């Protein structure tokens, strides 16, 4: 993706913050896990699983945006991600029905993560839809000039 598009740069800034937050949580949780695995597994394993899942999704989005040709492509990528998660949440299985309890818990945690991803992807879509600050300033200046030109 070419640099210089305020909307994409702003979205990537927030995306990178989310990636860094999840990666930091993974490092911290992994350290706790290595210190006392049994206690960690009982109290914090879900958090580590979710951080790994979210970090992976964010990084896939980052790669897709980095390879995008233009703003329309980035917009489509974000919208496709929203649609994918919403489809999984609305039309997918609520229960995994596996004989493995851990697999069932992992499935449930993925659904929770997808709910958060929909919120995050919508935030990104809102950023992409915003008018860049310099354009806002120009529009405000143009409106002010027009008001001055109009007779009272």
Label each region the model flagged:
Residues 4-32, 54, 74-93:
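Short amphipathic alpha-helical heptad-repeat segments
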Residues 48-72, 110-130:
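Amphipathic alpha-helical coiled-coil segments
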Residues 34, 42, 46, 56-106:
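Long, low-complexity or tandemly repetitive, helically biased scaffold regions used
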Residues 6-13, 41-52, 72, 108:
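Short, solvent-exposed segments of well-ordered alpha helices
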Residues 1-4, 25-43, 92-98, 137-147:
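Extended non-catalytic scaffold regions that mediate assembly and binding
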Residues 15, 22, 29, 44, ...:
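Amphipathic coiled-coil alpha-helices
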Residues 86-148:
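Amphipathic alpha-helical binding modules
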Residues 1-17, 21, 67-77, 130-152:
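Long, compositionally biased, intrinsically disordered segments
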């Amino acid at each position: 993706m070419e640099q210089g598009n305020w909307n994409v740069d702003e979205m990537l800034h927030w995306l990178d913050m989310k990636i860094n937050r999840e990666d930091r949580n993974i490092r911290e949780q992994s350290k706790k896990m290595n210190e006392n695995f049994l206690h960690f597994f009982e109290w914090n394993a879900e958090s580590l699983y979710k951080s790994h899942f979210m970090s992976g999704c964010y990084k896939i989005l980052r790669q897709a945006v980095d390879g995008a040709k233009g703003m329309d492509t980035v917009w489509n990528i974000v919208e496709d991600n929203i649609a994918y998660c919403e489809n999984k949440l609305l039309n997918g299985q609520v229960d995994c029905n596996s004989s493995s309890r851990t697999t069932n818990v992992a499935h449930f945690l993925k659904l929770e993560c997808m709910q958060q991803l929909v919120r995050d992807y919508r935030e990104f879509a809102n950023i992409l839809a915003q008018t860049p600050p310099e354009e806002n300033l120009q529009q405000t200046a143009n409106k002010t000039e027009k008001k001055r030109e109009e007779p009272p």
